[in-house]
Design a protein with these regions (language model features):
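C-terminal beta-signal and adjacent terminal beta-strands/loops
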Residues: 646-679, 692-700, 704-756
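Periplasm-facing N-terminal accessory domains of Gram-negative outer-membrane beta-barrel systems
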Residues: 19-109
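Surface-exposed extracellular loop regions of Gram-negative outer-membrane beta-barrel proteins
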Residues: 365, 455, 475-532, 551-571, ...
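A beta-strand signature from Gram-negative outer-membrane beta-barrel systems
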Residues: 96-98, 153-154, 198-239, 250-252, ...
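Periplasmic N-terminal accessory/gating domains of Gram-negative outer-membrane beta-barrel systems
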Residues: 80, 87-90, 109, 113-175, ...
């Protein structure tokens, strides 16, 4: 059935392609100095009133062009315009590699028109695009810009703490968010010191964050997608950087193995990066006022090799190794992740279709030794293979593909009642998808369909999706999305835990799962499922001020959780819950040549039902506000000032009713309960998560000075203050020791980065 479905997709899209008899221009726009792609450049065909914008990889296509002679004009702010004469014949598909030279000042209206064209022609519901420039502009801990810190200023995104915090997106837990790096699934993208991720900012090309309502090309998760794409190495010269701050040191090296030559688009290039934490070695000298120190240690290595053969064809080989460790007095936690793979892009001649493929594998292992609990360990490893096609017509765009996923999970855990839970499972999934984009006057529609087959469970899940946008006026647009989603991966995070360094992974259970509150009525399937509803408006108030308003509702129709209260071995290891998340996200962006301001506000509710009661999970935050501003000072903009303020209402927690002595009887009936001390057990309130922690607020400031010594040699010195007001934000309350544990206090820092 799966192969018949995919064959139908190919035949359908091939038929659409054969109907197109006019000419097509496609190509890539690059920076002439580094040969790096230029995203969102404006490409116009003078004489035909046709045009396009480049995507994140610098690619563009203009279809259904009448035959004749034209001038192709390419422009981008800060670059000289390029004008190319073009002659087109019937059925011709012409490829152009276009190189822009820095130094010109394209009109700001050109950039604005490029933005508006993209906004009017792309649905972009609940999609936020993040660039390295935006990440670097944010005041960051230690002066080290990182996507982990930038994600938290996006509407609908919440991080639960500076240390070991988890990322929650519009009511979805971390395991419901799929994090991708060049097509690879990254199971733990954030280090235990929550300021930093495994992704190197200088290596990022583009990050797409889908907070809900994503279309059919993404599957396997029920809440959100974070898609990180890295760039290729410099194709013309050897370059790099070194950086040092109180938190970490890092380096990057890149260059050509086969240099790009004039008149050719063929090259082989590489890029490699590494970073290592040093905060655990210097915290005693620099931050000795922090209770318990900052005992975090991590190391990240990533490398990429790119072969480009001309006409837009390329092959990437990549690999990574990430490690992390925490050494608290009562808790030792560590994890390691490694993987690699390849991806390719083919642009067949005289065809309106792009072929993309990816094959990756990855492995993740974690372990925790906690004085208050038994040791726990978890591992997940697997592979992913995908073949995707993009076919272009005049007002049509088809995306379709086939994917194969396989992974193994291993988890070992002993609950507080002494019952051991141990699971090792192998899982395989096949997915096929189709997304069709059609522009009809002011209306843009994107219906999609995904077929997800879970082989290990023998379950097929049909996932229709729909996105649309209606251009009410040039400055006002309505957009909406709807879709069904499923996944087979679940985690062991307990909703009672505000802080949990350890996250175990499991696949969907083979055993039967009962409906909430029932011991006889079984669920229809063993998948986690959800339905998304999103609607909102985009408003261009002025040329430089854009407002986005979105309301959303996520219906988590089935959530599978670990049964932590299991009493007997014959009881089920898993339970079913249901849930919902709903709210409104508002964001405004004001951009000038020297100044940028960003405001994001989220109002949200998250609820879960376990068969007995409806309760808010620990990441239910009612109000969340972020204010970000940057300003460039000086005749040559050599100074960059930044500020970020975050306010969030308190998270819920379950109140404590009392304590008791817990005897595990680990020696059986002969256990001595008279002279041996039992463990201290906690009696929780029957009403789950009815308490609320105090509100959170933090102000971060930064000042950066740029020094340029030559064309390629420059240095950035950044002074930053994290939690500048030294506010005592609560992290969690230690019930056993009856003491408050705060998040990190004021942390001033100075960092230096040298680029060559």
């Amino acid at each position: 059935m799966m192969m018949r479905f995919f064959t139908l997709l190919v035949l359908l899209c091939s038929t659409v392609q054969l109907q197109a008899q006019k000419a097509t221009i496609r190509g890539n726009v690059f920076d002439k100095e580094s040969a790096q792609p230029i995203a969102y450049a404006t490409v116009q065909l003078d004489g035909a009133a046709l045009g396009a914008s480049t995507d994140a990889s610098g690619f563009f296509t203009i279809n259904s062009i009448p035959l004749g002679d034209y001038t192709l004009k390419v422009s981008y702010l800060g670059y000289d315009n390029v004008m190319l004469p073009i002659s087109l014949r019937d059925g011709e598909v012409e490829y152009q590699a276009i190189y822009l030279e820095q130094g010109g000042e394209a009109l700001e209206e050109v950039v604005i028109s490029g933005y508006k064209e993209k906004a009017q022609n792309d649905v972009q519901v609940s999609k936020l695009t993040v660039t390295p420039k935006q990440i670097r502009a944010l005041p960051s801990a230690g002066g080290d810009a990182d996507i982990a810190q930038y994600l938290t200023v996006l509407p609908g995104v919440i991080l639960t703490g500076d240390q070991g915090g988890q990322l929650y997106i519009r009511g979805g837990s971390p395991v419901q968010n799929r994090i991708l790096l060049d097509g690879m699934t990254i199971y733990n993208p954030f280090h235990s010191l929550g300021f930093f991720s495994v992704f190197e900012t200088e290596l990022i090309r583009n990050v797409d964050v889908f907070t809900g309502g994503f279309n059919a090309e993404y599957g396997g998760r029920t809440s959100a997608i974070v898609d990180v794409q890295t760039r290729e190495g410099n194709r013309k010269r050897v370059a790099g950087l070194v950086s040092a701050s109180p938190f970490q040191i890092k380096g990057l090296i890149e260059g050509p193995l086969v240099k790009l030559k004039e008149g050719s688009d063929k090259s082989i290039s590489f890029v490699a990066t590494a970073k290592k934490a040093i905060i655990n070695q210097v915290d005693d000298q620099l931050y000795n006022y922090v209770d318990g120190g900052i005992p975090f240690n991590y190391q990240d290595i990533y490398g990429k090799l790119t072969l480009q053969s001309g006409n837009g064809n390329k092959l990437n080989l990549f690999g990574f190794n990430y490690t992390d460790g925490v050494d608290f007095p009562a808790t030792q936690f560590s994890w390691g992740s490694s993987g690699g793979g390849l991806d390719f892009q083919l642009l067949p001649q005289n065809s309106n279709t792009i072929v993309k493929g990816v094959f990756t594998f990855s492995d993740y292992d974690s372990e925790i030794n906690d004085a208050d609990n038994k040791p726990r360990s978890s591992g997940i490893n697997g592979y992913f293979a995908g073949l995707n096609f993009i076919s272009f017509g005049k007002d049509n765009e088809f995306r379709y593909g086939l994917e194969l996923t396989g992974f193994q999970t291993a988890f070992e855990f002993e609950n507080f009642r002494g019952v051991n839970i141990n699971q090792t499972e192998n899982t395989s999934e096949i997915g096929a998808f189709l997304r069709w984009k059609r522009k009809i006057g002011p209306l843009v529609i994107e219906p999609g369909f995904r077929l997800q087959y879970y082989l290990s469970l023998s379950d097929v899940y049909y996932e229709p999706r729909l996105g649309l946008k209606y251009n009410i006026t040039d400055n006002l647009r309505f957009k909406a999305a709807w879709g069904l989603y499923s996944q087979n991966l679940l985690s062991t995070i307990n909703d009672r835990d505000v802080v949990n360094l350890f996250v175990g992974f499991l696949s969907g259970p083979d055993e039967s799962i009962f409906e909430p509150g029932s011991t006889t009525e079984k669920t229809e399937n063993r998948l986690q499922t959800a339905i998304h509803y999103v609607g909102g408006f985009e408003i261009d108030l002025f040329k430089t001020l854009n407002l986005n308003i979105e309301g959303y509702y996520k219906d988590f129709t089935q959530l599978i959780s670990l049964n932590r209260d299991k009493l007997e071995p014959e009881e089920s290891d898993f339970i079913k819950e249901t849930g919902e998340a709903y709210g409104v996200d508002v964001s405004a962006k004001y951009e000038l040549r020297r100044a940028n301001f960003w405001v994001a506000y989220s109002l949200g509710w998250v609820k879960r039902f376990d068969g007995e009661q409806t309760y808010p999970p620990v990441f239910d935050r009612r109000h969340n506000l972020n204010l970000v501003g940057t300003y460039e000072v000086g005749a040559k903009r050599q100074w960059e000032l930044g500020a970020r303020f975050n306010f969030g209402t308190g998270f819920p927690f379950t109140l404590t009713q009392g304590f008791y002595t817990n005897y595990t009887f680990d020696q059986g009936i002969g256990s001595d309960v008279l002279t041996n001390n039992g463990d201290l057990g906690i009696v929780y309130s029957d009403d789950r998560n009815t308490g609320r922690l105090p509100a959170y607020s933090r102000l971060d400031l930064s000042a950066k000075r740029h020094f340029r010594f030559s064309k390629h040699l420059r240095m950035d010195v950044t002074a930053a203050v994290t939690n500048a007001l030294d506010r005592e934000n609560i992290f969690y309350f230690d019930r056993v020791r009856y003491e408050r544990v705060n998040q990190l206090p004021i942390l001033p820092s100075l960092s230096v980065q040298l680029q060559f």
